[in-house]
Design a protein with these regions (language model features):
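Short loop/turn elements that flank and shape the SAM/SAH-binding pocket of Class I
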Residues: 1
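Alpha-helix initiation/capping motif
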Residues: 30-34, 88, 117
Length: 140
């Protein structure tokens, strides 16, 4: 039975590559991924994307170099990179990346979630306003 192709694939994969495991198989499966499984996942993503399809993924900054290497090997091209900073002092927490099969101009940006004093940044509040039942700016 043939598999369909997708215009958009979004993934929030297990975050830890060869990290310290908890000992709980369910938790470990949800949070950890072996490099060879990561590679197969990228190969399958390439197979399932349409020629103009987009692949969005969020990964910890610590896995960024590995992800770039694997996606390059799988002929997925980076077209957008958003670096997420937890605070103005805690830089490079996560990367949201967008890949495609076609080479395109790279867009690079950053988003800081909280200010040093713990308040949400105006940019974060504006970006996520539709997802909250309360006004985050009121909590600032």
């Amino acid at each position: 039975q043939g598999q369909g192709k997708y215009d958009l694939i979004f993934s929030n994969p297990p975050f830890y590559l060869d990290g310290l495991k908890s000992g709980n198989p369910s938790i470990d499966q949800a949070k950890h991924i072996r490099p060879e499984v990561f590679r197969r996942w990228m190969e399958k993503t390439h197979e399932l994307l349409t020629e103009n399809g987009l692949f969005y993924v969020i990964v910890p900054f610590a896995n960024w170099d590995f992800l770039q290497q694997i996606t390059c090997e799988c002929q997925l091209h980076l077209m957008q990179q958003i670096t997420i900073h937890a605070t103005e002092e805690k830089l490079n927490s996560r990367i949201i990346a967008v890949f495609s099969k076609e080479k395109k101009d790279l867009l690079v940006s950053a988003l800081t979630i909280r200010e040093i004093n713990g308040k949400y940044t105006k940019e974060y509040v504006a970006l996520t306003a539709a997802f909250h039942h309360t006004d985050l700016s009121a909590k600032n």
